């Protein structure tokens, strides 16, 4: 009887210890998987951004920004909120009817970081004039992003010029 009690006690102890040890491994892998998922979702902002600009889809473009996002589009040209961001894009050269640009990007220059519910995104934009086949403009975007209500959105956009190095 004594051996049976010791055996049951040891068995219970093994079950408890193995259950505790197993949870830390799965949570570490879950964290790694969540991080990879977040990096992917943030990188999709760049894809949506360039697609919206190429198609001149202002609603899609503005939907990538948080409601209270800020955008700096040049020295002294900082705006806040989706409506002001919308107006900057609608008044830009790329949105004019006579402008036929395709927004391309060198994927290898894409940089994404994530830290919990916040992250950063950097990309270049190469605007190709469809009529001439030549590069019409080079720009870059440095973005702060945040997960808001389960969706990654741009909270701060800093546009700049980029140098094309071949």
Spell out what each predicted region is.
Residues 20-64:
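Short, low-complexity N-terminal intrinsically disordered segments enriched in polar/charged residues
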Residues 1-4:
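Positively charged n-region of N-terminal signal peptides that target proteins for export
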Residues 70-80, 95-98:
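A short gly/proline-enriched turn/hairpin at secondary-structure junctions
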Residues 27, 138-166:
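Short beta-strand edge/turn micro-motifs at domain boundaries
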Residues 84-133:
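Surface-exposed, charged secondary-structure patches
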Residues 7-17:
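Bacterial N-terminal signal peptides
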Residues 49, 61-62, 69, 81, ...:
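Hydrophobic pocket/interface hotspot
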Residues 65, 75, 123-127, 143, ...:
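A mature extracytoplasmic/lumenal domain signature
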């Amino acid at each position: 009887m004594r051996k049976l009690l010791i055996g049951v006690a040891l068995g219970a102890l093994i079950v408890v210890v193995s259950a505790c040890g197993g949870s830390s491994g799965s949570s570490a892998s879950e964290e790694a998987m969540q991080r990879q998922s977040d990096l992917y979702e943030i990188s999709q902002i760049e894809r949506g951004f360039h697609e919206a600009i190429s198609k001149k889809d202002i609603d899609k473009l503005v939907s990538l920004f948080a409601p209270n996002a800020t955008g700096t589009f040049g020295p002294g040209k900082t705006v806040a909120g989706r409506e002001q961001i919308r107006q900057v894009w609608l008044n830009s050269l790329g949105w004019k009817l006579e402008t036929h640009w395709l927004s391309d990007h060198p994927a290898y220059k894409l940089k994404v970081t994530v830290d919990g519910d916040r992250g950063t995104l950097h990309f270049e934009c190469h605007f190709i004039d469809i009529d001439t086949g030549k590069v019409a403009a080079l720009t870059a975007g440095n973005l702060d992003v945040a997960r808001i209500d389960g969706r990654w959105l741009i909270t701060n956009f800093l546009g700049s010029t980029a140098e094309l190095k071949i």
